[in-house]
């Protein structure tokens, strides 16, 4: 994949394909390419849900950590593309190699990027911290999976399903619990209900 990023894809799907990568950007190009390949195989591309995460934590690349604004923009773009634990780990290694030990805000940025990716895969449209609670809103509601999650002993008595016009889960945070860690736990446990 890195070779493709460096050298370019060339004429992958036909004579008119060459040269379009530069006009749409590499990331969008890969997405369009993946959709075209799925279409050629007769598969229906799964619509991607982009999860919004609003947690009350500081998550950024401080200017005193990455001084060059252009490098920061590039890193923000690349961090937003994190989809797996391995990609998060690789990005953390790169930050350490290039800029030294990252501050807590940079670690939080990596964690949020991975959380958003995992939540998006599960159809979670939004994760929000509000009034001592975590609220999870879903693009599609699977009541069997949500009921299974609500029955988890770790959340007993504090995870509620609001089945209104826009169903959502509400988890009351206990004193001392970190919203980020609990959001990760909720998303991981919700993913496990699909298996």
Predicted feature locations:
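Accessory helical-bundle/CTD segments and flexible terminal tails appended to RecA-like ATPase motors
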Residues: 1-195
């Amino acid at each position: 994949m890195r070779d493709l990023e460096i050298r370019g894809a060339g004429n992958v799907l036909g004579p008119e394909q060459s040269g379009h990568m530069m006009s749409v950007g590499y990331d969008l190009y890969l997405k369009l390419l993946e959709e075209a390949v799925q279409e050629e195989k007769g598969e229906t591309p799964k619509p991607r849900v982009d999860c919004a995460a609003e947690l009350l934590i500081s998550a950024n690349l401080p200017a005193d950590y990455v001084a060059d604004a252009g490098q920061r923009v590039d890193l923000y773009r690349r961090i937003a593309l994190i989809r797996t634990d391995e990609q998060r780990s690789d990005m953390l290694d790169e930050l350490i190699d290039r800029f030294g030990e990252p501050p807590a805000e940079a670690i939080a940025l990596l964690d949020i990027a991975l959380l958003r990716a995992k939540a998006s895969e599960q159809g979670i449209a939004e994760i929000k911290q509000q009034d001592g609670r975590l609220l999870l809103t879903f693009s599609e509601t699977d009541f069997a999976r949500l009921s299974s999650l609500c029955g988890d002993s770790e959340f007993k008595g504090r995870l509620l399903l609001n089945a209104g016009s826009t169903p959502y889960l509400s988890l009351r945070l206990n004193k001392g619990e970190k919203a980020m860690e609990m959001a990760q736990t909720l998303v991981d446990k919700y993913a496990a209900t699909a298996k």
